[in-house]
Amino acid sequence: MDIRKLFLDYFASKGHAVYESMPLVPDDPTLLFTNAGMVQFKDIFTGKVPAPTNPRATSCQLCIRAGGKHNDLENVGYTSRHHTLFEMLGNFSFGDYFKEQAIDHAWEFVTEVLGFSKEVLWVTVHESDDEAFELWQKHVDASRIKRMGDKDNFWQMGDTGACGPCSEIFVDQGEEKFHGSEDYFGGDGDRFLEIWNLVFMQYERSSDGTLTPLPKPSIDTGMGLERVAALKEGKSSNFDSSLFMPMIRKVEELTGKPYHYESGASYRVIADHIRSICFLLAQGVNFDKEGRGYVLRRILRRAVRHGYLLGLNAPFLHEVAEVVCGQMGDHYGYLKEKREHIKRLTFQEEERFFATIAGGMEVFKKELEKTQSVFSGEAAFKLYDTFGFPLDLTEDMLREKGIRVDLAAFEACMKEQRARAKASWKGSGDELKEGDFALLLEAFPSNSFVGYEKEAHTSKLLAILNRDYKRVSSLGAGESGFVMLEETPFYAESGGQCGDEGELRARGRIVAQVQGTKKYFGLNLSRIEALDEICEGETLEAVVSRERLEVQKHHSATHLLHAILRQKLGDHVAQAGSLVEKDRLRFDFSHPKALTHEEVGMVEEEVNRLISLSIPSRTREMRVDEAKASGAMALFGEKYGDLVRVVDFGEASVELCGGTHVENSAHIGSFYITKESGVSAGVRRIEAVCGMAAYHYGKEALQEIAEAKEILKAKELKLGIEKLKEQVRELKSEMSALSSSKSGAISEGVMMGETRVIVETLEAGDIKNSIDEIKNRYEKVAVLLLQVKEEKVMLAAGVKGEDRIKAGAWIKEIAPILGGGGGGRDDFAQAGGKDASKADEALQSAKNYALERLA
């Protein structure tokens, strides 16, 4: 039974538009991941955007709850129905049908399409919702309808805003399976399982708690696919269903051990976590030290650790990923397209963690032996800081033994990192909460952008904010703030393209310089510095800076670059971020390794070839589904409306894009890659210049070459460099010979058994080279040399073929005598000191140290 298809087809037959699952990374700074089906319709429910033409919608939404407010990670594997990734089936009405039809649809689908017996179905409603109680009685006997309080049956998005009562449908799994004291309807047991939540959004809650009926109430429902699938297959646990057993069977194959539910938590963790790993990697999230990438890393490391418990001591998750891509790739086609990319990045991250997990587990076991009930916070921090064990992974390991971590001590160790993290968020938007944006949104729901067609436009000045985002009626000369034009030609920063700069003109002169443009809560606002008084309500001429053309050149170049990277490196390449400015571009993309010098050159040449073909650009507006069907590249993480702009340069590049572009590829001029580097695991970065910036880059490069030739006194730079390299080689050879002669002059020391001990002052030469020369001369030797240069002291020690003396420990013992410090490996160490007057004392102590250990 394909429940996903049955659900979408059913609601399509009821006049609902079918929406694709939105990206797991939402265009919403308040959310870490998409965690509910209604997220992609949030702006409609809150009134920020108007309802679509068809006010009925349905979707099967991928959701992740692992990190942030909604975090199920620690429960996964230990319960029958917690998951990091799940699919939420939902139907939505935006001011169209309400309770009666929502209830009728739900009942019909559950009983007639899914085939659940009416005898096993129960319903809850809010204690005050008499209307829902009456409507349900058309389908269910009143004895099977239970009234519940706000905690269970009232839904709200936040402290204020849209909210309303909800109604839930439950399935009775049978008394014969579940018969604990909590297994009654409304209890905390597992006998009665909720499968569908119908939210009746009918109120607006004000700041004082007052509920005001909405003029057009809406419907938001959610049904967990995994839970319904398990019930339809007669399974008590989601993990026993056909959605998870293929991954569990693969783990059985890899371990050679059979899965049993009672002891199979590790199998369930792996089966769950690999789904999240596959989808996040496919959608452009990469392993990282912070943010979403860190959550992904935690998920993988938790799965690896559970594999380690099962005896898997080498990378294995990439093999389980193959199963996920095969099983779910028919509905989510990009899993098959990105299969090799997913497996490669998973394998690489596993390798990194397996390199440290054994050492970390050793530290964990030793600390555990000393632990009664509380695990050392310092040890937990060491596991985190040195071995890459996230705190929740350590807690997970201890949970099985009934032990907790000393969180206070752990937090004390983390204090410095937390302070740095807090500092990095400074200015990230908290000050905006104090601004007057609510007043602007109430007075002017939006302002329109007209800059695609024109770069100068006369418009009314609707509102002014000062630099603290407070609304004011005017700004005087020298004051800075923000302006909202009724129609603006200034492009607001978006999609990596910087916001437009320019001028505001009135009364025959320039009255303000526009220094940038951004969207704030959907409003296009330009940051300005006033040169003369400007007032709300007056008419201004807005003129975009000519530098926008240079920005457009760089933006169009990123499209061509993206296309060439996919063509030359593979379809796994996906945009992971970009920055487009007037004098440079930066393009981040998914790729597992650094580009070779030849690959960089090839990419640069191919982009320039497309530029030289003088390909006209074309911009079209079309429905998002039509655009994707036509082959236009859509980027994960981007939020698209019903209508989208498609920008193409012939067949070379076709992308969904809201930015501004050149009219012809030839207008880009030329394209030079200035740098290729890594951003994080699996993400590379190309920096480049084009247009006038490319001209200046080339001119400066030629100037540097001319200056270098002048310095080298060479007509050809390459010949001059080769000559210089030869001179350097000769000088190094002379220095090495000199160093060897000096080290040869050092005494042969004393023999202690079979080991030669040399402790001497080095008058001249390189101290490290001298140590190496002496070590090469003898089979067993412990040597420490001291050298004084300009009142500073250098110490170096080397040990070969002798375990009783460690060079690092030797140096640490002697360096303090000279007022310094240092250290190193067992075979070589060095240090510096400040007090040259103690040189003789230090040498004597060094001799005594060696002789005592070899006696």
Curated annotation (Swiss-Prot):
What are the entry keywords?
Answer: Aminoacyl-tRNA synthetase, ATP-binding, Cytoplasm, Ligase, Metal-binding, Nucleotide-binding, Protein biosynthesis, RNA-binding, tRNA-binding, Zinc
Q: Where does Zn(2+) bind?
A: 555, 559, 657, 661
Main localization (coarse): cytoplasm
Q: Which InterPro entries match?
A: aa-tRNA-synth_II/BPL/LPL, Ala-tRNA-lgiase_IIc, Ala-tRNA-ligase_IIc_anticod-bd, Ala-tRNA-synth_IIc_core, Ala-tRNA-synth_IIc_N, Ala-tRNA_ligase, Ala_tRNA_ligase_euk/bac, DHHA1_dom
NCBIfam families for the chain: alaS
First-tier enzyme category under EC: ligase
Q: Which cofactor does it need?
A: Zn(2+)
Entry coiled-coil feature ranges? none
- Domain free text: Consists of three domains; the N-terminal catalytic domain, the editing domain and the C-terminal C-Ala domain. The editing domain removes incorrectly charged amino acids, while the C-Ala domain, along with tRNA(Ala), serves as a bridge to cooperatively bring together the editing and aminoacylation centers thus stimulating deacylation of misacylated tRNAs.
Task: Provide the catalytic activity annotation.
Answer: tRNA(Ala) + L-alanine + ATP = L-alanyl-tRNA(Ala) + AMP + diphosphate
Give the protein name, as stated in the record. Alanine--tRNA ligase
Localization per record: Cytoplasm
UniProt-listed GO biological process terms: alanyl-tRNA aminoacylation; negative regulation of DNA-templated transcription
UniProt remark on cofactor binding: Binds 1 zinc ion per subunit.
Any idea which GO molecular function terms this record carries? Answer: alanine-tRNA ligase activity; aminoacyl-tRNA deacylase activity; ATP binding; tRNA binding; zinc ion binding
Q: What this chain does, per the record?
A: Catalyzes the attachment of alanine to tRNA(Ala) in a two-step reaction: alanine is first activated by ATP to form Ala-AMP and then transferred to the acceptor end of tRNA(Ala). Also edits incorrectly charged Ser-tRNA(Ala) and Gly-tRNA(Ala) via its editing domain.
Highest taxon, organism lineage: Bacteria
Q: Which family does it belong to?
A: Belongs to the class-II aminoacyl-tRNA synthetase family.
Q: Which SUPFAM superfamilies match?
A: Class II aaRS and biotin synthetases, Putative anticodon-binding domain of alanyl-tRNA synthetase (AlaRS), ThrRS/AlaRS common domain, Translation proteins
PROSITE patterns named among the record's database cross-references: AA_TRNA_LIGASE_II_ALA (PS50860)
- A Gene Ontology CC term for this entry? cytosol
